[in-house]
């Protein structure tokens, strides 16, 4: 039997040999993952043993693990071990997934090496730096400056903000001189919050992202690329679950309790969660004797315990695995108020141990890895961490097939892609048999013609095709002649022969017309021509986002026109019959939304407008690219003449990206479209300029770029909690409930004036829409000041985070918007466009996203990225084609 030290040394040697000998990161990661568990278990036993030369037995691991969990200096080893058990020890990953895991583990390995060297004098993982963790070099200077500020020990209390409770959205480690630091994305722990409310800060503290936390923040700044950039540093941290979240968990468990943040038992539990890096499930899963000790210590001297009756009831459900235990386990891992409230049903559910849960929660309790909770889609790794992963192969199979649909737009998954699942037919049968009989027809898996798919997706797609084919079976007699006469009589100036031809032939063979067109080819102009021909008819214009709807309003000059978002149309109760229904930006419309529109809207003629190469729908949406295979070709028109720009260099570049030519990189270099991250990002190239980012988080996400850009605004600073505002800031509204219908989601504006006093802040805001005093007559909290300028106040109520508060007036209803997301820019255009892409989000840059971004520019284009990121993005560009899905759909559904 090997000794403890031999166990460590052999695993260490295997890991180091792999790092030294293999250059391929994917293979390297897979080799290392198989050794991680051996190394960490050896170290855990080593820290507990007085004699490292003792024989290593696996039965020593569990005992040593319990000791390690209680040690604040060592408990990260238990956390690391748990992560390894739930990943490499249980699943076989492809290279890319293993690599991502290794990058996550790199932090733990660095901590392990430092701990073993400093406290035990042992040197392990000597060549860990040779593993290519591939940090973006463009961020290195920022990270070094941030690390310097974090390591500055002299911090006065005047520099610190009052501690506030925040939700931790995610943490991301970065490394400077073998030290570990964290980029933390967080937002206020209140019920009403959006992606735009997220803030990033930096710290050397290892903060859990499972629960809300009390953070003490420091407003600071760093100097990089000649600019002073504001940053936030987290100086102190402790777990601080909102009391209302315990109250809502209690309701689910049929208990009525009011937990107080200042109670002894609350503070005791928060201290355990903070100092031991543990979660509530660690307490729930304790042996009875240990749990009773913790309970006794927490409630000693407490007359009427509030928190432990909740934990007692949770243990009663979870320990014997009663019905509902998976739901309660998952909820206790994350304790997110909105999710907790969404599961509540006062009437209770007899099938879930009579807990106050919705019946809609049953599928998740039975098959959590392939279903969702009410109004909430759990993250995969949260499921792995909170639930038993044994005997879940049928669920993981379904998850794989559904991911192909939702993320790849692939309706039919080839059986060859599912080779890792043994006994495929048995797994499919197991899943289908576990479905509720009323759901089986749409949710069941089907294996046919060498492919596996979810029945409901096929049913919806076939229903859309059937409805549109029915509408396209006949056209309008005399339509072409009528249009020709209208063109002659109205002297309408249409400067594109393709548009004239399309207008004449639009409905002569079909009641459905498709208008495709590359970016800038005048699709909106074509829509306006159609609208004006049908000027005296009732017309409904739909688009997915408010900016796209606003764009239609600006472009369409015809009378009798109604404009709505897709979602508002899906929920409208009107029964107006429209002569013409026009849907813009069709690539962004999901199958489910289109089917809802077709079923709920009465119309005669249908015009579908969009570009299959621009951003696709977030949910499954294959209909727009597939429908051209099912309706008459005479009703399909493609606009080709570009009007957005006259710059031939831009046009050539757009065409190369659209068709994914081999010389995209050469075109970028020739036209100087590329730059590393530098001061040019913050120097305007035109008045009409926008910075486009892929997402909200990260050093170069939307929210932080907004902070950087705001620092160039010379007006005085107004600080509201962790956020800064200045007169002159451009803004984008994200909250609609408080000021509906005057202010709506994605409405643009600009701050004109700010007043502030303890407990409140008041804004005068110019809105990018006409507003009169009459418009705000019935809105008590909105005051009209002058032309399109309105005033409102936001309040700061102490204890808002403790209570289950759904009020709007404590939330800033807008975001500072020097930068916006690529998704929100679809359908819009700017004289100058700057795009920021870092290695943190390069994997999310699809062909449609990249093409949409670069085609927003009329004159100036600059992409800020490293050469490595550019190469990675360009190499991964590929068009999503669904010809196989179309053939299978025709064969299976008789279409």
Model-derived features: where do they sit?
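Extended low-complexity, intrinsically disordered and solenoidal helical-scaffold regions
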Residues: 2-203, 211
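N-terminal accessory nucleic-acid engagement/regulatory domains that precede
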Residues: 120-127, 133, 138-476
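Short amphipathic C-terminal alpha-helix that caps PH/PH-like domains
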Residues: 461-472, 654-657, 853-857
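Conserved adenine-nucleotide phosphate-binding loops and their immediately adjacent elements
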Residues: 477-490
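N-terminal pre-P-loop "Q-motif" helix
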Residues: 490-511
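ASCE P-loop NTPase helicase motor core
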Residues: 504, 508, 512-669
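Conserved RecA-like ASCE P-loop NTPase motor core of nucleic-acid helicases/translocases
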Residues: 513-556, 609, 664-708, 717-724, ...
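Core RecA-like ATPase module of SF1/SF2 helicases and allied nucleic-acid translocases
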Residues: 521, 560-564, 633, 645-648, ...
């Amino acid at each position: 039997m090997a000794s403890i030290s031999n166990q460590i040394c052999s695993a260490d040697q295997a890991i180091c040999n792999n790092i030294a000998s293999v250059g391929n990161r994917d293979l390297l990661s897979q080799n290392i993952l198989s050794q991680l568990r051996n190394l960490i278990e050896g170290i855990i036993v080593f820290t507990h043993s007085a004699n490292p030369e003792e024989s290593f037995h696996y039965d020593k691991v569990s005992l040593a693990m319990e000791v390690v969990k209680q040690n604040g200096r060592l408990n990260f080893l238990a956390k690391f071990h748990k992560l390894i058990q739930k990943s490499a020890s249980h699943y076989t990953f492809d290279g890319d997934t293993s690599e991502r895991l290794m990058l996550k583990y790199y932090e733990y390995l660095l901590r392990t090496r430092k701990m073993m060297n400093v406290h035990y004098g042992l040197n392990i993982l000597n060549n860990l730096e040779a593993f290519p963790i591939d940090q973006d070099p463009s961020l290195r200077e920022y990270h070094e400056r941030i690390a310097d500020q974090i390591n500055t020990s002299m911090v006065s209390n005047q520099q610190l903000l009052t501690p506030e409770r925040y939700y931790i959205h995610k943490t991301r480690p970065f490394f400077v001189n073998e030290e570990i630091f964290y980029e933390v994305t967080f937002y206020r722990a209140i019920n009403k919050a959006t992606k735009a409310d997220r803030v990033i800060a930096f710290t050397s503290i290892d903060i859990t992202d499972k629960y809300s936390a009390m953070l003490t923040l420091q407003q600071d700044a760093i100097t990089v690329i000649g600019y002073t950039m504001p940053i936030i540093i987290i100086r102190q941290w402790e777990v601080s679950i909102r009391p209302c979240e315990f109250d809502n968990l209690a309701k689910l468990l049929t208990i009525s309790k009011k937990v107080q943040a200042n109670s002894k038992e609350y503070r005791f539990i928060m201290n355990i969660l903070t100092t031991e890096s543990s979660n509530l499930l660690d307490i729930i899963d304790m042996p009875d004797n240990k749990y009773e000790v913790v309970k006794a210590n927490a409630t000693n001297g407490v007359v009427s315990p509030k928190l432990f009756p909740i934990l007692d009831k949770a243990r009663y459900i979870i320990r014997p695995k009663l019905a509902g235990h998976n739901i309660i386990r998952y909820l206790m891992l994350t304790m997110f108020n909105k999710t907790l409230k969404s599961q509540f049903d006062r009437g209770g559910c007899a099938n879930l141990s009579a807990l106050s849960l919705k019946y809609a929660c049953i599928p998740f309790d039975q098959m959590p890895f392939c279903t969702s909770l009410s109004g909430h889609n759990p993250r995969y790794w949260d499921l792995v961490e909170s639930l038993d992963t044994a005997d879940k192969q049928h669920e993981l199979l379904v998850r794989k097939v559904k991911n192909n649909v939702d993320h790849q737009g692939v309706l039919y998954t080839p059986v060859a892609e599912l080779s890792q699942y043994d006994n495929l037919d048995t797994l499919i049968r197991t899943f289908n048999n576990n479905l509720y009989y009323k759901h089986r027809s749409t949710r069941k898996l089907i294996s046919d013609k060498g492919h596996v798919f979810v029945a409901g997706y096929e049913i919806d797609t076939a229903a859309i095709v059937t409805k549109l084919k029915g509408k396209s079976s006949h056209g309008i007699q005399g339509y072409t002649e009528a249009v020709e006469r209208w063109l002659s009589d109205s002297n309408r100036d249409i400067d594109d022969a393709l548009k004239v031809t399309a207008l004449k032939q639009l409905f002569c063979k079909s009641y459905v017309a498709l208008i495709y067109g590359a970016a800038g080819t005048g699709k909106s102009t074509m829509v306006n021509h159609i609208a004006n021909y049908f000027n005296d008819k009732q017309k409904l214009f739909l688009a997915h986002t408010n900016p796209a709807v606003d764009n239609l309003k600006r472009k369409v000059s015809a009378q009798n026109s109604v404009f709505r978002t897709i979602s508002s149309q899906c929920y409208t109760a009107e029964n107006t019959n429209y002569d013409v229904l026009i849907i813009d930006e069709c690539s962004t419309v999901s199958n489910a939304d289109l089917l809802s529109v077709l079923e709920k809207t009465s119309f005669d003629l249908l015009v579908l407008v969009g570009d299959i190469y621009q951003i696709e729908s977030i949910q499954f949406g294959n209909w727009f690219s597939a429908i051209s295979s099912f309706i008459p070709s005479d009703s399909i028109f493609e606009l080709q003449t570009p009007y957005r720009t006259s710059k031939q260099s831009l046009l050539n570049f757009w065409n190369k990206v659209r068709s994914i030519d081999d010389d995209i990189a050469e075109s970028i270099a020739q036209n100087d479209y590329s730059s590393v991250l530098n001061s040019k990002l913050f120097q305007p190239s035109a008045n009409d300029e926008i910075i486009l980012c892929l997402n909200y988080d990260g050093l170069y996400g939307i929210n932080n770029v907004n902070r950087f850009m705001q620092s160039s605004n010379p007006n005085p600073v107004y600080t509201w909690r962790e956020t800064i505002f200045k007169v002159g800031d451009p803004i984008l509204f994200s909250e609609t409930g408080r000021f509906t219908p005057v202010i709506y989601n994605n409405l643009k504006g600009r701050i004109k004036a700010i007043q502030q006093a303890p407990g409140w802040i008041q804004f005068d805001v110019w809105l990018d829409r006409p507003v009169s005093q009459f418009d705000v007559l019935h809105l008590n909290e909105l005051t009209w000041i002058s032309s399109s300028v309105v005033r409102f106040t936001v309040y700061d109520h102490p204890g808002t985070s403790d209570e289950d508060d759904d009020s709007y007036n404590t939330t800033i209803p807008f975001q500072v918007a020097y930068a916006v997301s690529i998704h929100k820019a679809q359908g819009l255009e700017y004289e100058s466009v700057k795009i920021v892409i870092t290695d943190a989000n390069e994997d999310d840059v699809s062909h449609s996203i990249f093409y949409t971004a670069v085609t927003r520019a009329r004159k100036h284009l600059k992409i800020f990225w490293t050469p490595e990121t550019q190469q990675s993005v360009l190499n991964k560009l590929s068009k999503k084609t669904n010809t196989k899905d179309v053939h299978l759909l025709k064969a299976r559904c008789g279409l």
